Every structure is written in structure tokens, then in C-alpha cells.
């Protein structure tokens, strides 16, 4: 049986640029959790200044998640005022 892409389950590597202020991580992780996206690891890589705003680079690696759940979560994350950009969304293949 061939699955639709929304039914495929995989891990994801996400790289986001967000405002470097309290509550941003809670907003993002709350959205992911509400869409059944479990976080395997998360790290703040660096801070930078964009148009005089202090920004942070966040890298998240998820546990296995359905493609559709990830798409739905990212659609909500895109609406956050604290989001600068979603730099990467990469499927991670298991070994």
C-alpha cells in the first residue's frame, strides 16, 4: 500500500530564527505539543541582530511524527509574532 505523504512518519530537523526573549521557547514547544510533535532535542545555537532586534537560532530535532502533524504545527508557528524565519525543515532518516 502506498501512503499519502501526510501519513509518513519520520523525525525532523528544524532550524528557526526567533526573537531572543522570554516565553518564545514555550510558545513554540506548546504548539508542537498540541500537534503531537514530541521533541528529541533542542538547542539555542547563537544570537544575532536583525534590523536592531536580538534574535536567536534554535535547532529542534523531533521524535517520529506524522508529516501532516508537522505541517499543521509549522503552519501555526509561522503565525507567531516572535518568529523571524523557518530556515530549515529536513526529514531525518533512521539508520
Set out the residue ranges of the language-model regions.
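A conserved regulatory-domain signal marking ACT and ACT-like small-molecule sensing domains
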Residues: 1-95
Amino acid at each position: 500500500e502506498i501512503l499519502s505523504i501526510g501519513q509518513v512518519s519520520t523525525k525532523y530537523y528544524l532550524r528557526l530564527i526567533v526573537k531572543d526573549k522570554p516565553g518564545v521557547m514555550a510558545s513554540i514547544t506548546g504548539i508542537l505539543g498540541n500537534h503531537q510533535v514530541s521533541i528529541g532535542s533542542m538547542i539555542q545555537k547563537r544570537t544575532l541582530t536583525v534590523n536592531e532586534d536580538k534574535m536567536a537560532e534554535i535547532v529542534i530535532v523531533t521524535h517520529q511524527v506524522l508529516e501532516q502533524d508537522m505541517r499543521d504545527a509549522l503552519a501555526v508557528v509561522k503565525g507567531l509574532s516572535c518568529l523571524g524565519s523557518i530556515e530549515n525543515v529536513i526529514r531525518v532518516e533512521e539508520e
